[in-house]
C-alpha cells in the first residue's frame, strides 16, 4: 500500500481478513459504513514491516491506530493482500457497463455481520 492511494476490500478475501485478527471485523465495518473505500494517509515501519496507521474514508471520516475499540484502525503488511486498489468510476458508463432494461446494479460487501441487512436490501430493491 502507498500513501495517497485508495483501496477497497477484495470481496473474496474478507473472511480471510477477519480470520487474521478479532479487530479486523471492526475494520471491515469501518470501511463498509464509511463509503466502501479509503485513502492511506500514514504508514509506519516497525521491525521491517509496514503498517497503515491512518486512513481517510470515502465519506471523510478519519481512523487511525490511536483509536480505541471500534475506532481502532491499523493494517499490517501481511494483511495487504486482502485489499485491492480502488478505481473511481469516471463516467456512468464505467459504473454500469451492461445497460440492460430492468436491471439494477448494486455493489455491496457481505459478511456474516451484515448478511441479513443485505438480503433485506435486495428484497426491497427487487420486490416492489
Curated annotation (Swiss-Prot):
It holds the Pfam family FRD2. It comes from the Viruses. This is Uncharacterized 14.8 kDa protein in frd-Gp32 intergenic region.
Amino acid at each position: 500500500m502507498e500513501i495517497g492511494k485508495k483501496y477497497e476490500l477484495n470481496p473474496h478475501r474478507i473472511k480471510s481478513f477477519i480470520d487474521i485478527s478479532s479487530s479486523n471485523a471492526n475494520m471491515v465495518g469501518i470501511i463498509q459504513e464509511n463509503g466502501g473505500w479509503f485513502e492511506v494517509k500514514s504508514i509506519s515501519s516497525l521491525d521491517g514491516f509496514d503498517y497503515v496507521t491512518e486512513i481517510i474514508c470515502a465519506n471523510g471520516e478519519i481512523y487511525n491506530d490511536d483509536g480505541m475499540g471500534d475506532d481502532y484502525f491499523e493494517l499490517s503488511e501481511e494483511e495487504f493482500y486482502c485489499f485491492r486498489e480502488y478505481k473511481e468510476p469516471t463516467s456512468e458508463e464505467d459504473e454500469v457497463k451492461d445497460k440492460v432494461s430492468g436491471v439494477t446494479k448494486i455493489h455491496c460487501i457481505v459478511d456474516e455481520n451484515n448478511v441479513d441487512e443485505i438480503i433485506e436490501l435486495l428484497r426491497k430493491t427487487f420486490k416492489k
